[in-house]
Curated annotation (Swiss-Prot):
Organism, scientific name: Clavispora lusitaniae (strain ATCC 42720)
Name of protein: Stress response regulator protein 1
PANTHER family: TWO-COMPONENT RESPONSE REGULATOR, TWO-COMPONENT RESPONSE REGULATOR ARR22
Modified residues (4-aspartylphosphate): 114
Originating gene: SRR1
Gene3D superfamilies listed in its UniProt record: 3.40.50.2300
Length: 191
């Protein structure tokens, strides 16, 4: 394993990297991982610092981020505001404080949920959201380290529209494209 300092949005973190940890570019369980060990940064481009040109989506969407880790919330919020500069992004660190009702969640276009949280998990929140017909237009995206085939199948059964693997270090255009696909599917792009 190689330990490399990686500059992140909120400061200097250390990332442990091995070829078996390579992110795949799809939610497919059958993806083949081809590793070229010449450039570690090509495997883990920072979504906030990559040099890839993209056009931000200027629609005033409303997003809810639920994660028990404050640093994850800050990083993901900053990334979303880079991709959607006119969006409203609310963060919640206490999963138990998320009231799941039409009145409280219907104004969100998309909810990003960490899966492993104390008290109330992301899968429990997703199950409750999807059990309410009134919240069908709200998109759900899992953001998690649990990314095995069985996990992805469970998230799909629970009604998640997509899953990002943590750390979220995909190319910016890929993240933007996947979020826009969920927005189009769930709410028809409505603002």
């Amino acid at each position: 394993m190689i330990v490399t300092p990686v500059s992140e949005v909120e400061g200097e973190f250390f990332k442990t990297w091995s070829p078996s940890m390579k992110s795949t570019s799809s939610n497919s369980c059958n993806s083949k991982n081809h590793i070229d060990t010449r450039d570690i940064n090509s495997f883990y481009p920072s979504p906030v610092e990559d040099s890839e040109a993209f056009i931000p989506n200027n629609q005033p969407y409303s997003f809810l981020l639920v994660d028990d880790n404050e640093i994850n919330l800050r990083i993901f919020r900053r990334m979303l505001l880079k991709l959607f500069p006119n969006a409203s992004v609310r963060t919640v660190q206490e999963s138990a404080s998320v009231e799941i009702s039409h009145r409280t969640l219907s104004h969100y276009h998309l909810i990003f949920l960490d899966i492993e949280m104390p008290i109330v998990t992301g899968t429990e929140i997703a199950s409750k959201v999807r059990s309410s017909r009134e919240l069908d237009q709200v998109g759900l995206i899992a953001v998690t380290t649990k990314y095995l085939c069985a996990d992805l199948e469970l998230y799909e059964k629970l009604g998640f529209d997509f899953t990002f693997r943590k750390p979220v270090e995909y190319p910016t255009n890929y993240i933007l494209q996947k979020i826009e696909q969920v927005l189009q599917t769930r709410c028809g792009g409505r603002v």
